[in-house]
């Protein structure tokens, strides 16, 4: 079930933090759920969602053991790039696979 309430109403909080609000749960019902932040980026809100969500785009790019820092359901930008760009770039977007979980590959969009 997908909840949009506070952490008490979220089935699975992001590691290291309460469930983000506002929130969206990925993947869809039947595949298990997790929380994905749709607000400005918070580094601790992270789960490997790109493999199952419509698309993920981080609001900011931070060094993290997590594959995604913050996700919002926006247009996917499937540009493959060197993963190490993420911690050093001021503006990154992930490639969003649609079928399976896999590490996020980062890109540096024009203008960043």
Curated annotation (Swiss-Prot):
Restricted to a narrow region of the hair fiber cuticle, lying approximately 20 cell layers above the apex of the dermal papilla of the hair root; not detected in any other tissues. Residues 10-100 are annotated as: 15 X 5 AA approximate repeats. Belongs to the KRTAP type 12 family. Sequence repeats lie at residues 10-14, 20-24, 25-29, 35-39, 41-45, 46-50, 56-60, 61-65, 66-70, 71-75, 76-80, 81-85, 86-90, 91-95, 96-100. In the hair cortex, hair keratin intermediate filaments are embedded in an interfilamentous matrix, consisting of hair keratin-associated proteins (KRTAP), which are essential for the formation of a rigid and resistant hair shaft through their extensive disulfide bond cross-linking with abundant cysteine residues of hair keratins. The matrix proteins include the high-sulfur and high-glycine-tyrosine keratins. Interacts with hair keratins. One of its GO terms (cellular component) is cytosol. Keywords: Keratin, Repeat. This is Keratin-associated protein 12-4. It comes from the Eukaryota.
């Amino acid at each position: 079930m997908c909840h949009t309430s506070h952490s008490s109403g979220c089935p699975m909080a992001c590691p290291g933090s309460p469930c983000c609000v506002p929130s969206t749960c990925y993947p869809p019902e039947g595949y298990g759920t997790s929380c994905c932040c749709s607000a400005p980026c918070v580094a601790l809100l992270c789960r490997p969602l790109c493999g199952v969500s419509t698309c993920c785009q981080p609001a900011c790019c931070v060094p993290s053991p997590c594959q995604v820092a913050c996700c919002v359901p926006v247009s996917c930008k499937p540009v493959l790039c060197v993963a190490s760009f993420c911690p050093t770039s001021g503006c990154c977007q992930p490639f969003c696979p649609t079928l399976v979980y896999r590490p996020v590959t980062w890109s540096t969009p024009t203008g960043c």
